[in-house]
């Protein structure tokens, strides 16, 4: 596996916990987006970007500066996958919508973005983070479906590992 890092934005700790789980399974480092700089980006070939979702489907606040860093460092030649944390019961119309902003930023910065997971098996009404019948990354709901998190992470990692 090429140099890989997990970068996350988390306000309540759920997305941080997921990021640390993913990083542990890959044997890589997880870093809070509030602590990244251009060197963090340029020194890794693969970036796994995670955000919790807030408001009307926005990414976690620290990501707004993080996106500026992604763009200034540039992502040409890098592989990106994203994961999002949401609450499909309380916010069924914006489930994991923050992933869309990360996806758009990665594409704009020149990254090769890996496909996401199927929407099958998820309960929600709508999300900006969907393309066809797939999420733009791995969608997780630690509030209502935490019993599915481990299985979803493992399946996603199996899907993306060949590209990392």
Walk through the language-model features, giving the residues of each.
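Short, charged N-terminal beta->alpha structural module
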Residues: 2-26
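FMN-binding flavodoxin-like domain, especially the glycine-rich phosphate-binding loop
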Residues: 14, 25, 29, 43-47, ...
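A short beta-strand-loop structural module common to alpha/beta enzyme folds
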Residues: 28-38
């Amino acid at each position: 596996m090429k140099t890989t890092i997990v970068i996350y934005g988390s306000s309540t700790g759920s997305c941080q916990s997921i990021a640390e789980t993913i990083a542990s399974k890959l044997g890589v480092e997880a870093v809070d987006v509030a602590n990244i700089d251009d060197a963090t980006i340029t020194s890794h070939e693969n970036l796994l970007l995670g955000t919790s979702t807030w408001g009307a489907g926005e990414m976690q606040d620290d990501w707004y500066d993080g996106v500026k860093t992604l763009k200034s460092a540039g992502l040409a030649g890098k592989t990106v996958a994203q994961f999002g944390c949401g609450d499909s019961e309380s916010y069924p119309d914006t489930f994991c919508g923050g992933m869309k902003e990360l996806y758009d930023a990665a594409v704009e910065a020149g990254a090769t973005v890996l496909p996401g997971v199927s929407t099958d098996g998820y309960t929600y009404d709508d999300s900006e983070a969907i393309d066809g019948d797939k999420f733009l990354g791995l969608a997780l709901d630690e509030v209502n479906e935490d019993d599915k998190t481990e299985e979803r992470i493992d399946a996603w990692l199996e899907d993306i590992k060949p590209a990392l």
